[in-house]
A protein has these predicted regions:
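Cleavable N-terminal signal peptides of Sec/SRP-targeted secreted and luminal proteins
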Residues: 2-17
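Intrinsically disordered, flexible peripheral segments
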Residues: 17-763
Length: 763
């Protein structure tokens, strides 16, 4: 009897533990976004470490997928997943990449398991089990996509990818210094700290400089743009864009919110990234993006200086790399065949794939073009047992294959990926922009086949832009602290305490700009809804020559677009740079975000006010190109057009203060029927283009140049030790200030950073 009683008490204790856990996270949290948010944070914390959270361990170890097949809406997905487990999936600790077909199929299967969980309870149980048993990279990727596409995960904020896995965003020398601090428990020689750029705050937080003036891996003048291509905000933007619009996801699965004009926005995002990159090239007096010629060498190499968690270094591509070799000559031929097929289809106005005819002659057929280049063409099948990557998406895969990782002629499962093979790092490599320019030419050809916009399509009867005034535009470089604590392992004591004793931050130099406003005076003879679009583009090329509008229109970046209600008479529209469409300020460190989430009472209000565009947003820092010290001449193009609302739209979508979090600020402009990039997306007939409801105005971007302590320290410790100063010739720049970045700011740690440390905002 006593033993039975003890058994019952033991079972009761175990049951109570789970009951309390489920009450906290699941039962009471069915409508509690705050508790769901905290649980996702736990799942993605210290992803490379063994699980230390007992609640997640208990859920994961006590959940048996085999005995709960009925908890998923697509049971064939579960059966397929269990079969893969028997065969064996990518082990923990290995590098994950979407470019390997087998790894792609595995991670898509993992996503389907999470996506087709019947309820949030099953979703969390499945995620906890996966966190314990599956490859870390696959788990993070699948969970991230699932959170963005499940209806019951709306409003959940994900930790930025550079905190989850810092290895893709922090240089290898900084990682090495972080391990040095960890191994020596912070007991470093003061001179060594000064040489390495390591500081310690009063609260014991370690700050390591990522010195942009250390140019040992510079191979050519393209390295002057590293401040832009390696910006953590820009690479996060591109990664989350892929998460919202994965190339492998069927239309019948993808979230309805982002399904509308899915492939048009994909093409437009790539075109805009190219345009934004080109503005930085002009700022640095570099020429246009050189097209990728498969019959020639890649003149510009790239040294990533990145090392992964398992010690694998991302490969270097040296200058003058030969593209076509005996090993890949067949792939190069296949690329040309695919390009010819798409080109001929655009010219003919249609293409046939497996008996399916697809038109390519109407404006709305841009969806077909996007599928041909970046997506999947299927016959609206609902089967999920097979990941479909046929049609011409192989064009992009093949282009990457001849330059980076080659999965086409190799059956390797364990690989060394290049920077091109990960969405977190692809923008770093200059050849990425050459590849995308080659693909973007197909979009330009498609748009060229469409007629120019008529005056009737451009004009807004009764509406006139009287004046546009732009504040002085000034850019500069400042300090940004990024939490890289997850890059170093926990010791046994820390594992027991479930957190690291050290906080390690990396100080990065990032482009920024002074806050500015754009004021537009509009006269209207009626009260009417309208769409206001603002584009920023160059006036001159890198040599100071005026650019023809038809050649230049592809270089204009859409910095703002919004809906507005005009009233009869004069309207003064004031747009602040911090309020422009779909931009995001610097993301909070996850450790600070967790503290806020735990203490606030109205989580949804916090999301709307403080975390707007947190996932979808383009970095506010990069709204303007760097410009030049003496000023870079630019043009701001503003156009006001009538709102042609898409049929069946809920008008409450226009209210950006809504707390139901169903507003996707990346695509609110899609409420208007006009094409993305209108009216600069098509060939311009200068005889009919200019109308009263549009205006071009000149503006100048100035770059503020000051002294950086990273540079002075480099000069003090490195250059003075040698009789010969490094005389590497980089393009037409002999001044070190023009190499890499014209970094500014004070000789000491940024005053704002010090102030935050004093106030206790940074531990």
């Amino acid at each position: 009897m006593k033993s039975v009683l003890c058994l019952l008490l033991g079972l009761a204790a175990i049951a109570a533990k789970f009951i309390n856990l489920y009450i906290f996270f699941l039962v009471n949290g069915v409508g509690d976004l705050k508790q769901r948010q905290l649980l996702i944070f736990k799942l993605l914390n210290n992803i490379l470490e063994p699980l230390v959270d007992k609640d997640i361990i208990d859920i994961g170890t006590n959940f048996d997928i085999r005995n709960n097949v009925e908890l998923y809406t697509k049971q064939e997905v579960v059966k397929g997943f269990l079969n893969r487990l028997k065969v064996g999936m990518l082990p923990r600790g290995e590098v994950f990449t979407l470019q390997i077909d087998r790894q792609l199929k595995e991670v898509v299967n993992i996503f389907h398991m999470l996506y087709f969980a019947k309820d949030f309870d099953t979703f969390i149980k499945t995620a906890c089990w996966m966190r314990l048993n599956l490859n870390e990279g696959m788990f993070v990727y699948a969970l991230t996509v699932a959170v963005r596409h499940r209806e019951d995960c709306k409003g959940i904020i994900l930790p930025p990818p550079y905190e989850i896995y810092p290895y893709y965003f922090v240089r290898a020398d900084v990682i090495q210094k972080a391990y040095l601090i960890k191994m020596k428990r912070g007991l470093l020689d003061e001179k060594l700290c000064d040489l390495y750029g390591i500081r310690v705050t009063e609260k014991g937080t370690y700050i390591i400089d990522e010195n942009v003036f250390d140019k040992r891996v510079a191979l050519n003048d393209e390295d002057r743009l590293r401040y832009f291509t390696e910006d953590i905000g820009l690479n996060t933007y591109y990664y989350y864009f892929h998460i919202d619009y994965p190339f492998w996801m069927n239309d019948n699965i993808i979230n309805n919110k982002v399904k509308t004009r899915r492939w048009e926005i994909t093409l437009y995002i790539y075109q805009q990234i190219l345009a934004r990159y080109n503005l930085e090239r002009i700022s640095n007096r570099m020429g246009d993006i050189v097209g990728l010629d498969l019959n020639k060498t890649i003149k510009k190499g790239y040294w990533p200086w990145l090392v992964l968690h398992n010690g694998v270094q991302l490969p270097v591509r040296l200058n003058n790399k030969i593209i076509t070799t005996d090993k890949n000559v067949q792939i190069v031929k296949l690329i040309k065949v695919y390009e010819n097929i798409i080109t001929e289809a655009i010219i003919k106005g249609f293409v046939e794939i497996n008996g399916l005819r697809l038109d390519l002659h109407k404006p709305e057929d841009i969806e077909v073009l996007g599928k041909l280049i970046y997506g999947v063409v299927d016959k609206h099948t609902t089967t999920l047992s097979k990941t479909s990557v046929e049609a011409y998406r192989y064009l992009l895969l093949l282009l990457k294959a001849v330059i980076g990782l080659n999965p086409v002629e190799s059956d390797k499962y364990f690989v060394v990926p290049t920077v091109l093979d990960s969405y977190q790092t692809a923008l770093r490599d200059p050849v990425f922009y050459q590849i995308q320019k080659r693909l973007c030419n197909l979009l330009i050809l498609f748009k060229k086949r469409l007629p120019c916009y008529t005056r009737e399509e451009l004009i807004f009867p009764g509406v006139k832009i009287d004046n546009v005034v732009v504040d002085k535009l000034v850019t500069y470089f400042d300090d940004h602290l990024m939490d890289m604590t997850n890059a170093v392992i926990l010791n046994n004591d820390e594992l027991k305490k479930t957190k690291s004793d050290m906080t390690i931050l990396v100080r990065k130099r990032r482009l920024n700009h002074q806050r500015f406003k754009v004021v537009v005076d509009v006269t209207s003879d009626k009260t009417v809804d309208c769409v206001v679009r603002m584009f920023l583009g160059p006036k001159e090329d890198g040599l100071g020559r005026l650019i023809d509008i038809n050649k230049n229109r592809h270089n204009f970046v859409e910095i703002d677009s919004f809906l507005y209600k005009l009233v009869t008479g004069k309207n003064t529209i004031v747009r602040d740079s911090i309020d422009m469409h779909n931009i995001v300020r610097d993301r909070l460190m996850t450790r600070d975000l967790v503290k806020k989430v735990e203490t606030i009472t109205d989580f949804k209000d916090f999301l709307v006010k403080d975390l707007r565009n947190y996932i979808t947003g383009f970095p506010a820092r990069l709204l303007l190109p760097k410009g030049r010290t003496g000023g870079l001449k630019m043009m701001l193009y503003v156009i006001v057009t009538p709102l042609k609302l898409v049929d069946g739209v809920d008008l409450s979508m226009l209210d950006v203060t809504r707390k139901d979090l169903l507003v996707d600020f990346r695509s609110t402009v899609l409420l208007d029927k006009m094409p993305l990039g209108f009216p600069l997306d098509r060939e311009i007939d200068v005889g009919t283009f200019f109308t009263p409801n549009m205006k071009f105005v000149d503006c100048v971007i100035f770059h503020k140049q000051q002294v950086c302590d990273m540079k002075t320290r480099w000069n003090r410790w490195v250059l003075k030790q040698y009789d010969l100063v490094d005389q590497t010739f980089i393009g037409d720049n002999f001044n070190i200030n023009n190499y890499n970045v014209d970094v500014d700011i004070t000789r000491d740690l940024n005053r704002d950073v010090l102030e935050n440390i004093k106030l206790g905002k940074i531990d």
